[in-house]
């Protein structure tokens, strides 16, 4: 079905080697970067000179899924590659 195809398009690898091979991986600088490697991640990120956004759904082993959507604006936030990973890392620490 269509939902299976969409999930396949949005699934992101947290494997460092795969991320290095794809400089536009939608993990580094976004929510997925803040997750532990064992997490399963589906996301859609966006970045422009005036904005950095991400919508991510992830699941850690033996935990309920988490959905986080972050919109930011302004050139300083758009260049900030640590804000979104820090938010995901903090939130994933409260999951479970």
Locate the predicted segments by residue.
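Penicillin-recognizing serine hydrolase domain
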Residues: 1-96
């Amino acid at each position: 079905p269509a939902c299976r195809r969409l999930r396949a398009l949005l699934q992101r690898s947290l494997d460092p080697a795969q991320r290095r091979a794809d400089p536009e991986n939608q993990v580094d600088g976004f929510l997925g970067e803040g997750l532990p490697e064992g997490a399963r991640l589906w996301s859609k990120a966006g970045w422009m000179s005036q904005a950095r956004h991400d919508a991510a759904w992830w699941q850690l082993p033996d935990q309920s899924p988490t959905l986080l959507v972050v919109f930011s604006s302004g050139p300083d936030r758009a260049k900030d590659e640590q804000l979104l990973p820090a938010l995901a890392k903090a939130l994933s620490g409260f999951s479970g």
